[in-house]
Amino acid sequence: IVEPSMHGMVEVMRGCGRGCKFCDVTLRSLRYYSPEKVKKEIEVNIKKGGIDRAWIHSDDIFVYGMDPTTTKNMEPNRDALEELFTAIMSTGVKHTNPTHGTLAGAIADEKLIPNLSKITNAGPSNLTGIQCGLETGSIRLIEKYADRKLAPYKPEEWHWVVKEAVKTLNENYWIPAFTLIMGLDNDETPEDGWETIRLISELEQEQPDS
């Protein structure tokens, strides 16, 4: 960028690699901007716009620096992510958060979220927001349309993935905002809908502080 971006948003990558059948993003090949380029764009926002925060845009931040053709289980590249966020914070911004990330990606490496939280100074007065695609609580639908959204986990583990990811994120001062898809491909049955409702209800009951 050559002029300040809206809300301090800076793109760090394009594409996803998870292959969900309802998403056009999966048609794009994965491409990444280097930490050096990201840092320079944030500095434009600081110097020309006086923006003291960096809103980091990606389609799934947890695949940054990953090659999905060789990383079949979609494990995050923790080193690349730590390098990226270290570069971001070195600009002097007071706050940063990614736009999007998968729930499975947040827990595939148990050290990832705690380490990133330390780098970004996440805490009670500095919460990190992230948008995550829950999409459906239906095991049938998630397996049919988005099985790699759960990688490295299996479709039958979806409810556990959702609950464990919310727990991990919240414990490290990350606040996920969920998206849901109603009537997925005109294939959603009443039972699929109730399965989603049950998952959300269980999440609320089991993690009331989430």
Predicted regions and their residues:
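Conserved SAM/AdoMet-binding glycine-rich loop
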Residues: 43-175, 182-190
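Auxiliary Fe-S-binding modules of radical SAM enzymes
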Residues: 194-210
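A short small-residue
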Residues: 23, 177-180
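Short intrinsically disordered, low-complexity coil segments enriched in acidic
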Residues: 1-5, 179, 210
